[in-house]
Amino acid sequence: MPSQKIRIRLKAFDHKLLDQSVGEIVDTAKRTGARVAGPIPLPTVINKYCVLRGPHVDKKSREQFEIRTHKRLIDILDPTQQTVDALMKLDLSAGVDVEIKL
């Protein structure tokens, strides 16, 4: 796999958990001899939900909730077979969504 690139995109609601997972991936890739570009922070998506506080009347009384989705992008350039094997065996946290493109 000499001229390929692995693009890893991570999403999580907790940025500390996300940064910890990114660190593990970068350390694993560098340890096996691949070049790493990133982590690149992508824009945070903020979903806001507005709900009525009371069950019956008072439309003016509302409450807002938000969910922030933090994202990071990592490019692994010139991956070796050991890099791919190490990334497959890597155990990340349950709160992190990982998308891998070759």
Curated annotation (Swiss-Prot):
GO terms for cellular component: small ribosomal subunit. GO terms for biological process: translation. SUPFAM superfamilies: Ribosomal protein S10 (SSF54999). Pfam families: Ribosomal_S10. GO terms for molecular function: structural constituent of ribosome; tRNA binding. Keywords: Ribonucleoprotein, Ribosomal protein. The keyword Iron does not apply. Involved in the binding of tRNA to the ribosomes. Part of the 30S ribosomal subunit. Belongs to the universal ribosomal protein uS10 family. NCBIfam families: PRK00596.1 (NF001861), rpsJ_bact (TIGR01049). PANTHER family: 30S RIBOSOMAL PROTEIN S10 FAMILY MEMBER (PTHR11700). This is Small ribosomal subunit protein uS10. It comes from Geobacter sulfurreducens (strain ATCC 51573 / DSM 12127 / PCA).
